[in-house]
Amino acid sequence: SSGAQILNPGSTKVQDFIVDTCMEFLEKYDADAIHFDDYFYISGVATDLSGDQKRANVDSFIKKLSDSIHEMNKREGRAVQLGISPSGIYRNTGYAASPSYDSNGSLISPIGSNTSGFAHYDDYLYSDTKKWIDNEWIDYITPQTYWGMEHTGANF
């Protein structure tokens, strides 16, 4: 009812549009980084996709943008970074998954922290930032921790 439009993070056209926009910005301006804050899926918008499908869509976008930035950096001798500011909790431990590891010892199933708050792996952002760091798709992460140490759900 507000007239706002929401871009679908799973759409290849949307992903390409955002990647192209970021790359055009980097071509025109001497920027140090592309940084995303409050991004991807939003709350209150119904969808038929599972959490895994949404994470795969977001992964696809982040990898596309990362690959484009890395290619530009190599070609032009630049050092532009890609960063993300997710919520301060990756995933809470209140779920029934056990951690598993690949042949190199890298974690392949997500684990969480001893917290009880909004977590960006699940909830509505569906962002596997640990995967992005492990695969070097992002250069830095700046978690949004807008609470004090006395917060009982996440006392850090």
Q: For the regions a protein language model found, what residue spans apply to each?
A:
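General secondary-structure edge motif
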Residues: 5, 112-113
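Glycoside hydrolase catalytic-domain groove-lining segments
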Residues: 48-106, 110, 116-156
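Active-site groove signature of glycoside hydrolases
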Residues: 17-50, 139-144
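Aromatic- and acidic-residue-enriched carbohydrate-binding clefts of CAZyme catalytic domains
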Residues: 1-8, 40-56, 60
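Active-site-adjacent "subsite" loops/lids of carbohydrate-active enzymes
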Residues: 1-24, 28, 105, 120-124
